[in-house]
């Protein structure tokens, strides 16, 4: 029988960080949102997606039905490698529903400056209709984290991104210990990059991941804006995706966590309302709450918000990046 496995369980931890120390645990994708592993003849699972994702598939029609129920007009599809190389599938989705779905291109981040990946990006944008690119530093796992976003091998990639005039959606996704120290160092790297690439529009996805990393800490420590994050987001052309319901997913009902209201207010005061963008992480969000409920914090709570400000957070600001 399968036994539930927590994400930080030592079974999944190699001797060091990177693909060279990847443990052999017979990894496989299961059903009902589960990832499965075997260790010492015992099978384990991790609940990665909600159980409602029976066969780990989400058709565009399924997403559109969810959007209609939640009152969402358009969606941005963040194309992380962990979902697979979905260039053709997502390309078909956005061509079929161009007024509903915006696609982000994908590259192998550690090889992004190589001709093959440059051609791949050009094809996704110019032929398949992708309008931005998703870039996760988790990709550096494939080279044992021996490079970063400011590596000179990526210069040709950034030049192409600027030439194509597309936004970058960033994920500080190394996710290795010491967790907070690495996360803050990644934000520092992004800030260095931002100052050298001021013509490229950027969105920091999975905003305020520090909240998730600091579980168990006092609220006064956990629900703080890191100084480096504020500094990064003050760069021109930088915005942040607010996914606060997942960062505080251990609380009973995140939209009613008053610490999150305070963070939204602090962000407005520090960087301005025009840089804030709601993100759901659908279908992942349904491990915590429904797609519709992921909007509650911005549509119903945060009493200091005007209606115009609510509209900007829940689509208006993103609409400026990807107008119809």
Outline where the language-model segments fall.
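Short aromatic-enriched loop/helix-cap "lid" or pocket-rim segments at secondary-structure transitions
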Residues: 2-9, 88-89, 117, 145-147, ...
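Conserved, mostly hydrophobic/aromatic
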Residues: 67, 90, 161, 240, ...
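Short, glycine/acidic-enriched loop or turn micro-motifs at the edges of active sites
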Residues: 2, 109, 174, 209, ...
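Active-site gating/metal-coordination segments in enzymes
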Residues: 73-74, 78-185
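Alpha-helical scaffolding within the catalytic cores
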Residues: 58-63, 85-91, 115-121, 186-191, ...
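Catalytic pocket-lining loop regions of alpha/beta-barrel enzymes
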Residues: 131-132, 140, 147-277
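Mid-to-C-terminal alpha-helical segments outside catalytic/metal-binding sites
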Residues: 2-69, 73-74, 265-266, 270-277, ...
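Active-site metal-binding loops of divalent metal-dependent hydrolases
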Residues: 1, 80, 207, 280-282
């Amino acid at each position: 029988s399968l036994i539930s496995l927590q994400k930080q369980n030592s079974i999944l931890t190699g001797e060091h960080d990177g693909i060279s120390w990847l443990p052999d645990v017979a990894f496989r994708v299961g059903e009902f949102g589960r990832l499965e592993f075997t260790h010492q003849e015992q099978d384990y699972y991790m609940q990665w997606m909600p159980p409602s994702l029976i066969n780990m598939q989400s058709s565009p029609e399924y997403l559109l039905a969810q959007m209609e129920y939640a009152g969402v007009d358009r969606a941005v599809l963040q194309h992380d490698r962990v979902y697979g190389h979905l260039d053709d599938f997502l390309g078909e989705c956005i061509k079929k529903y161009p007024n509903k779905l915006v696609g982000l291109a994908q590259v192998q981040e550690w090889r992004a400056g190589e001709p093959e990946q440059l051609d791949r990006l050009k094809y996704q944008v110019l032929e398949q209709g992708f309008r931005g690119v998703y870039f996760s530093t988790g990709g550096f796992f494939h080279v044992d984290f021996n490079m970063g976003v400011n590596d000179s091998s990526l210069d040709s990639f950034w030049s192409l991104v600027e030439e194509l005039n597309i936004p970058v959606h960033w994920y500080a996704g190394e996710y290795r210990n010491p967790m907070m120290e690495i996360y803050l160092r990644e934000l520092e790297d992004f800030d260095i990059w931002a100052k050298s690439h001021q013509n490229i529009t950027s969105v920091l996805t999975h905003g305020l991941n520090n909240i998730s990393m600091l579980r168990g800490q006092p609220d006064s420590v956990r629900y703080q804006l890191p100084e480096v994050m504020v500094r990064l987001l003050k760069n021109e052309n930088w915005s942040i995706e607010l996914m606060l319901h997942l960062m505080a997913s251990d609380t009973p009902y995140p939209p009613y966590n008053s610490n999150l209201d305070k963070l939204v207010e602090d962000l407005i005061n520090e960087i301005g309302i025009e840089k804030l963008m709601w993100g759901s992480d659908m279908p992942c969000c349904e491990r915590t709450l429904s797609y519709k409920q992921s909007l509650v914090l911005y549509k119903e709570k945060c009493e200091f918000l005007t209606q115009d400000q609510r509209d900007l957070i829940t689509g208006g600001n993103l609409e400026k990046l990807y107008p119809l």
